[in-house]
Curated annotation (Swiss-Prot):
NCBIfam families: bioW, PRK01322.1. Pfam families: BioW. Keywords: ATP-binding, Biotin biosynthesis, Ligase, Magnesium, Nucleotide-binding. Its EC number is 6.2.1.14. It comes from Methanocaldococcus jannaschii (strain ATCC 43067 / DSM 2661 / JAL-1 / JCM 10045 / NBRC 100440) (Methanococcus jannaschii). This is 6-carboxyhexanoate--CoA ligase.
Length: 237
């Protein structure tokens, strides 16, 4: 018997400014409880109380791809300078030029994007909408992975969401991802590559905005990549 699965997406904003977003892939029996959980998350976000919450529920028609999560490693850094240099080394090892990494930090420091910027190795921005960026959608983790991350202190609830994005992104051929949280008080960021998901403490200072950048090869088929990032359903185990 085929189990029908549903994608539930939440986004919340205030005065048109993005506050929070989240997504789950669940079966029919779990829809009601999941919607409650996502609404609660929207209403209690540290970035403020939204004046607009959108919940979208869709049956998933396409076959879901199940993949293993990237190995998780935490690197403790004493301050932002050390953290940024640590992230830079990991990205450099993937063949990304320093000038492109510096540009990625500029984009992240500016903040305000709901999705990710996409940079090739020449430093060209490839996402069609530079304000919105590209949203990685139709993703979730298994309950087992979520429990493992929280029980074994591999990370936080935010890590659970981020490992889903990072694992899908790298699986689809992105060279690396650099990310810091848009939660003002959360200063741990990460770099993801095919070698793993590297949580890096103090990648930004408290109160600073966050952002996300994907690094891709110069010959990438950008339309195909964006289509898969946004639409192809993945569950990370």
């Amino acid at each position: 018997m085929v189990i029908v699965m549903y994608s539930i997406k939440m986004r919340a904003s205030k005065n048109g400014k993005h506050i929070s977003g989240a997504e789950r892939i669940v079966n029919k029996d779990e829809i009601e409880e999941t919607v409650k959980e996502l609404v609660r998350r929207a209403l209690t976000h540290e970035n403020g109380t939204p004046d607009f919450i959108n919940i979208k529920i869709e049956e998933i028609k396409e076959e879901i791809t199940y993949i293993n999560h990237l190995p998780i490693k935490t690197i403790h850094c004493k301050d932002k300078e050390e953290a940024r240099e640590t992230a830079k080394k990991i990205l450099r090892n993937e063949g990304i030029p320093d000038s492109v990494i510096d540009y990625a930090y500029e984009i992240i420091d500016k903040g305000g994007m709901r999705g990710a910027a996409i940079l090739n190795l020449k430093g060209e921005r490839l996402e069609p909408d530079k304000e919105r960026g590209v949203r990685v959608k139709n993703i979730d983790t298994t309950k087992e992975l979520k429990e493992k991350i929280l029980k074994e202190n591999l990370g936080t609830e935010r890590t659970v969401d981020a490992i889903a994005i990072a694992s899908k992104v790298i699986h689809l051929g992105v060279i690396a991802e650099l990310c810091t949280s848009d939660n003002k008080s959360y200063t741990t960021g990460y770099v993801a590559t095919k070698k793993g998901y590297f949580r890096i403490t103090n990648l930004k200072k408290e109160g600073e905005s966050g952002g996300r950048v994907f690094f891709v090869k110069d010959d990438v088929d950008i339309e195909d990549l964006i289509n898969k990032l946004e639409n192809k359903p993945f569950i990370i185990k």
